[in-house]
Amino acid sequence: MSVRFQSDDEYMRNLITTSGISIGTQVKTKFMKQFISDTDPTGTYTLDLEATQGRIKAAAQFIEHTGASELIVCSGKDSARVPIRKFAELVGCKDIHKRFMPGTLTNPDLPKYMEPKLLLVCDPQVDAQAVTEATNAGIPVIGIANSDNVTSRLDVIIPANNRGRGALAAIFWLLAREVLVIRGEVDETKPMKYEIDDFETKDVREDE
């Protein structure tokens, strides 16, 4: 999907819709009820577009306030490997795109022990170990959550489809762009270094 960013609300809605960001699941948790706007004939929930856009902006502001160098973005999903690497490259944070080793945030004796001030995860269930350790260490957590996720340990929820490769690419592209716009490094009416296609994992085997 090759796109040129515009601040126009209609354009943004089209981008979110075509990328599948707003596609939920057929399960709704009490935590995600507030972010659901509709249900399609198959019983699949639709996530609220305005809420998604608003939370992406809030997350970007949180990241910039904390400092991207203090952020770790991680995911145990194969489909998220390219999106989080591109995101980390653009905003200047650290990424963990393979297995999250227990103790990474809580055991100073580990060689790869880290002390971030903020954590970003793609799925609070898949990335439960990272979320648990961050919570125990007092580290705030930003999480992308679908309609069936439990979000009780997330400080900032980005309601979005966290399953689809295209959706993950779009989410991280939008979030990276928003961070760069806040910094003044990108003009919101012009293309940036990468397009959404560049953020998508084409083949989950490519990182193996």
Curated annotation (Swiss-Prot):
GO annotation terms (biological process): translation
Pfam families: Ribosomal_S2 (PF00318)
GO CC annotation, single: small ribosomal subunit
InterPro entries: Ribosomal_uS2, Ribosomal_uS2_arc, Ribosomal_uS2_CS, Ribosomal_uS2_euk/arc, Ribosomal_uS2_flav_dom_sf
Recorded superkingdom: Archaea
Molecular-function GO terms, alphabetical: structural constituent of ribosome
This protein's UniProt keywords: Ribonucleoprotein, Ribosomal protein
SUPFAM superfamilies xref list: Ribosomal protein S2 (SSF52313)
Family stated for the protein in its record: Belongs to the universal ribosomal protein uS2 family.
Protein name, as recorded: Small ribosomal subunit protein uS2
Taxon lineage: Archaea, Nitrososphaerota, Candidatus Cenarchaeales, Candidatus Cenarchaeaceae, Candidatus Cenarchaeum
